[in-house]
UniProtKB/Swiss-Prot annotation:
Family of the protein in this entry: Belongs to the TRAFAC class translation factor GTPase superfamily. Classic translation factor GTPase family. IF-2 subfamily.
Pfam families attached to this UniProt entry: EF-G_D2, GTP_EFTU, GTP_EFTU_D2, IF-2, IF2_N
Protein's recorded name: Translation initiation factor IF-2
GTP-binding is among the record's keywords: yes
Organism: Campylobacter jejuni subsp. doylei (strain ATCC BAA-1458 / RM4099 / 269.97)
Binding positions (GTP): 362-369, 408-412, 462-465
Length: 854
């Protein structure tokens, strides 16, 4: 068995290598570094000494008490005894032993011997494996010892020897004996220096064992030996015998023994609870299977995954069935569901009636904002670009001493998410339908949103002051959607109104309050506040701003709040008119300042006790959303792989999108992502709320052919200059129609042009003339249109195209002609065609390119 290195012993025992070196040196082994190697039985001796603090028997027998007064004379006696022992050995080995003895004599100067005596005490043993004996240099005599010899036939692994040694050590601990040596004991270390007459001495064949003085607990390190030992090793390896000399020093093998990997026994798992978002390797660890097993199962099921990919619920359930394990899927979002915690803690005492929240919905340009303007006695619609609402607004009105909160939503098709959000946080929905226009697509969508939210619906038929108003048509169309008016035996209130004259407005508000009384809307103003964010944005000098409607509790200035990934303290609040407020009560709306970032529109805002609690909720939510986003990006099946490869070949228009509010940004992103076909698409590199910054310009410049789109915002002078220097185009809009139309035009320019054919004329071949060195010339009669020189033609025979090419020559009699019109004869030469026949037709045409549009 190969020798064992010190660092392997240290690793096996769980000790540091330095500690093992110290213990080995206490046994006189002369170990210098962790890479030094010892014989297996020496390793066992070190192990026993470390575990029991008892000197092994093999070392006790060799220890004697020499008196080192006359080292030179003793060396002479040693040589005499060595010579006597050599006489008994065969003649072949006599020369080698003499050379070894000469080395011992010549390389032991007085200075080194005295330094060794001062620094280190002990005996030196030189072992020779070849003769299976040890030559021991002592003060008085040399004895042969085979106590520490190696039995080559019984070589065990390091771990086996140590495990066997543990059993013997338990017995030895009971029979501990103290060993005390004389302080006068000393060791003279032989110094092998730079000589060429080493013979066949090998570093692998000899080991040095120093038996120290154990009475000295802390011995000084031999400085002289430490200095010379590295030199000795380097010289010994380098001094290989040259040409004509005997064998040199053998180089020690550098190969490390192969590491043995222990196989861990995996316990069988019958049931396990895992989260929805889990990676492949995490799932494998949970069920006690190897990652490769899980990946191979998924591959057989048609999913190409790596160990870092996320698994969806379907894949988890299928894998559970395959492995025969019961899986309980848990939702990690429950840990930071602050809304659930709030509802559990809500006390139903002290409930009072709150203001109703009304959402006005309907098709674009049906008069929703104008109706609200008349109610509020304001002109919001005139302030909107293009006269269409592109933001969600929340307003407060008072009727008969009672407050009503109105939410105005956009009617444009791009703002579907806004309408859905408005329906989900409202108490009553008013659907506005123009009496002269009837039910439109967004009207149907608004009704579906309201039905999905399960809230009462009131129909307001607007523009009743117009001559073309037809309320019966509106009622009929809505009846087809199962919205039956009360007068027709249904359960829905229909009110005819005019936002221009104010007709029917009072009746509408009366019905709203009556419906609110039926709903019995209650809230506890004394509890922690709970609100819904209907819009959010970034304002210069104020930071993140959110428009909210409080549903329960009272939100005051200084309250600590959390909304999704955003949190903070409410620094200031104001109403829809900009008037500062100190608190917002249930059912009321307002604008708050103080969130750490722009909160997502539609997020629930909760007031909490401490800032630490809010931060923890927000951070956990952020990490969860990040993991969820990563899981979406890594899930792919074999069927989807082809689609992804195809998508990679699409031309893309890189866009950086900035908007004034979160709701508009969502609507724009959704609309732009729909602008695509099999050839082109819009690639939104970055989107955000707020003005266009220099970092946006830098990002756009890093992407080839990218543009910056701004909605309801304007870039500053510095940003414009930066964009000009970088060659980045900035386009700003205040009407969503214009933005979408321009992007469509840009995408159309990126598409391959549409190539169409325009027929020019047709000629009948009546004679074929073979011209030497030129080829065939067709004598033709033009039957339709004109034949142009250089035009593209098709040669048609019996209705089948037999050749396509260009007109190489066109003659009228003997003169060249640019074109020949209908009814005239001409000679036509077709480039590369020598198979023209009488009766064939020549069809002339040109290709026209048209710009594609999306």
């Amino acid at each position: 068995m190969a020798k064992i290195r010190i660092h392997e012993i240290a690793k096996e025992l769980g000790y540091d290598s330095k500690e093992i070196i110290e213990k080995a040196n206490e046994l006189g082994l002369g170990i210098k570094t962790a890479s030094n190697a010892v014989e297996p039985d020496i390793a066992v001796a070190i192990y026993e000494y470390i575990q029991t603090r008892e000197i092994p028997e093999a070392f006790k027998k060799n220890i004697k008490t020499p008196t080192a007064k006359k080292p030179k004379k003793e060396n002479a006696k040693d040589q005499e005894k060595l010579n006597e022992s050599e006489k008994k050995e065969p003649k072949k080995e006599e020369s080698k032993e003499q050379e070894k003895q000469e080395i011992i004599d010549t390389h032991k100067p007085q200075s080194l011997a005295s330094a060794t005596l001062a620094k280190r005490r002990g005996l030196v043993i030189v072992k020779k494996k070849k003769d299976e004996e040890e030559i021991q240099v002592k003060k008085e005599e040399i004895k042969n010892s085979n106590d520490i010899s190696i039995n080559n036939e019984e070589r065990l692994s390091l771990k086996t020897m140590f495990s066997n040694a543990d059993e013997s050590l338990k017995k030895k601990k009971k029979e501990k004996k103290s060993f005390v040596a004389s302080k006068k004991e000393s060791t003279e270390k032989m110094n092998f220096l730079d000589e060429h007459d080493f013979g066949d001495i090998s570093l692998d064949d000899e080991d040095e064992v120093v038996l120290p003085d154990f009475s000295v607990k802390e011995q000084e390190k031999p400085q002289n030996i430490n200095k010379k030992q590295p030199n000795f090793i380097r010289q010994a390896v380098g001094n290989s015998a040259g040409f004509g000399l005997e064998g040199g020093i053998q180089r020690r093998s550098r190969k490390k023994p192969p590491k043995k990997i222990e196989k861990k026994e995996v316990e069988e798992v019958s049931s396990v609870s895992i989260s929805k978002e889990i990676r492949v390797y995490e799932f494998a660890d949970k069920i006690g299977k190897s990652t490769s097993e899980v990946i191979s199962k998924l591959f057989m099921l048609g999913m190409m995954t790596t160990k870092n990919d996320f698994l969806d619920e379907d894949a988890i359930e299928i894998l559970a069935a395959e492995f025969g394990i019961e899986i309980n899927i848990i939702n990690e979002a429950d840990e930071f569901d602050y809304v659930k915690d709030y509802e559990e803690e809500t006390d139903e005492k002290d409930l009072v009636t709150r203001a109703p929240v009304i959402t006005i919905m309907g098709h674009v340009d049906h008069g929703k904002t104008s109706l609200l303007d008349y109610i509020r006695k304001s002109r919001v619609a005139s302030g909107e670009a293009g006269g269409i609402t592109q933001h969600v607004g929340a307003y407060m009105v008072e009727k008969n001493g009672r407050k009503i909160t109105f939410i105005d939503t956009p009617g444009h098709e791009a703002f579907t998410a806004m309408r859905a959000r408005g329906a989900s946080i409202t108490d009553i929905v008013i659907i506005v339908v123009a009496a002269d226009d009837g039910v439109k697509p967004q009207t149907k969508e608004a009704i579906n949103h309201a039905k999905a939210a399960g809230v009462p619906i009131i129909i307001a038929i607007n523009k009743m002051d117009k001559e073309a108003a037809n309320p019966d048509m509106v009622k009929t169309q809505l009846a087809e959607m199962e919205i039956m008016p009360v007068e027709w035996g249904g359960s829905y209130e229909f009110v005819g109104v005019s936002a221009k004259t104010g007709m029917g407005i009072e009746d509408l508000l009366e019905i709203v309050l009556l419906q609110a009384d039926i709903l019995e809307l209650k809230a506890n103003p004394k509890s922690f506040a709970k609100a819904s964010i209907i819009e959010s944005s970034v304002q210069k000098g104020r930071g993140a701003v959110a428009t909210i409607i409080v549903q329960n509790g009272t939100l005051a200035v200084g309250s600590t709040v959390v909304a999704g990934e955003a949190y903070g303290k409410v620094r200031a609040m104001s109403d829809d008119q900009g008037k500062a407020l100190k608190e917002i009560k249930p059912g009321e709306c307002g604008v708050i300042v103080g969130l750490s970032e722009v909160a997502d529109a539609g997020e629930i805002l909760i007031a909490v006790k401490t800032d630490k609690e809010a931060r923890e909720y927000a951070n956990k939510r952020h990490e969860y959303n990040r993991q969820k986003e990563l899981s979406k990006s890594t899930k792919v099946s074999i069927d989807e792989l082809g689609a992804k490869i195809k998508e990679g070949n699409l031309k893309a228009l890189p866009v950086i999108l900035k908007a004034d509010v979160q709701g508009s940004l969502e609507a724009l992103k959704a609309s732009l992502e729909k602008l695509r076909n099999d050839e082109i698409k819009v690639n939104i590199i970055y989107s955000g709320v707020g003005g266009i910054t220099q970092s946006d310009i830098e990002l756009a410049s890093a992407s080839e052919n990218s543009i910056v789109l701004g909605f309801n915002i304007r870039p500053t002078g510095e940003v414009k200059e930066r964009a000009k220097d970088k060659g980045v185009e900035i386009k700003t809009y205040n009407v969503i129609y214009n933005l979408l139309d321009d992007v469509k035009a840009l995408l159309g320019g990126m598409m391959s042009p549409i190539i169409s054919e325009e027929q020019l004329g047709q000629a009948e071949i009546r004679q074929v003339i073979n011209v030497p060195k030129i080829g065939q010339i067709a004598g033709c009669m033009v039957t339709e249109g004109v034949i142009n020189r250089g035009a593209k033609i098709r040669l048609i025979r019996d209705g089948v195209v037999v050749y396509e090419g260009n007109v190489s020559s066109l003659k009228r009699f003997k003169d060249d002609a640019k074109e020949v019109a209908k009814g005239y004869e001409c000679g036509v030469g077709i480039e590369g065609c020598d198979d023209m026949r009488v009766g064939d037709y020549i069809e002339s045409y040109k290709e026209v390119e048209e710009q594609a549009s999306l």
